[in-house]
Amino acid sequence: MLSSSPASCTSPSPGTDNPDKKVHWASEKRRRASSTDSESKTHLDISKLPRSRRPSRLTVKYDRGHLQRWLEMEQWVDAQVQELFQGQEESSEPEIDLEALMDLSTEDQRTQLEAILQDCPGNREPFISELLSQLKRLRRLSRPSK
C-alpha cells in the first residue's frame, strides 16, 4: 500500500545513498535532457538537412511533379512564342496566360490564342493545336485560399 506520510513524498536528494532515489534522479536527468533535445530540434539548421528532409513550403500545397509539368509547359510556350516571333522586337512578343486559358472552353481557347497571336509572322496553327492538346492534359493549379 502507498504511504500517506509526507516524508515519503519528498523529492530525493542527490547526496543520499538510497538506490531508489538514484534511479529517480537518473530518470529526472533523462527527462531534462530530452526536453532540451526537443527544444534544440526546433532550431535546426535547415541547410544541413538532406534535400529529402528539408521542409518545402511550396510542395506542401502542390505536388512537386504537377508544378514541374506547369514549369515545363510555360517554358515550352515561351520558346515557341520566341520562335514564332523570331526576328521581331522582344517587346512585341505576347504574353500567354495558361491559367486564364484553362478557364475557357476549347473553342474559346482557340479564339483567344488566335487573337493573341494575330501579329505573328510565322505559321501559328501548329503551335495553337499543340498547345490546346497539352492544355487538355494539364490540371489546373488551385488558387491559394485567403
UniProtKB/Swiss-Prot annotation:
Instruction: Please describe the post-translational modifications of this protein.
Output: Phosphorylated on several residues.
Residue ranges under compositional bias (Basic and acidic residues)?
18-28, 38-48
- Annotated keywords: Cytoplasm, Phosphoprotein, Protein phosphatase inhibitor
Compartment annotation = Cytoplasm
Family matches, as InterPro entries: CPI-17, CPI-17_sf
Region annotation Interaction with protein phosphatase 1: where it falls in the sequence: 21-25
Query: Recorded GO terms, molecular function?
Result: protein serine/threonine phosphatase inhibitor activity
The question of whether DNA damage is a record keyword is answered with no
Which positions, given as ranges, span the membrane? none
Functional note: Inhibitor of PPP1CA. Has inhibitory activity only when phosphorylated, creating a molecular switch for regulating the phosphorylation status of PPP1CA substrates and smooth muscle contraction.
Instruction: Report what the protein is called.
Output: Protein phosphatase 1 regulatory subunit 14D
Provenance organism: Mus musculus
Supply the source organism's classification.
Answer: Eukaryota, Metazoa, Chordata, Craniata, Vertebrata
Q: Which gene encodes it?
A: Ppp1r14d
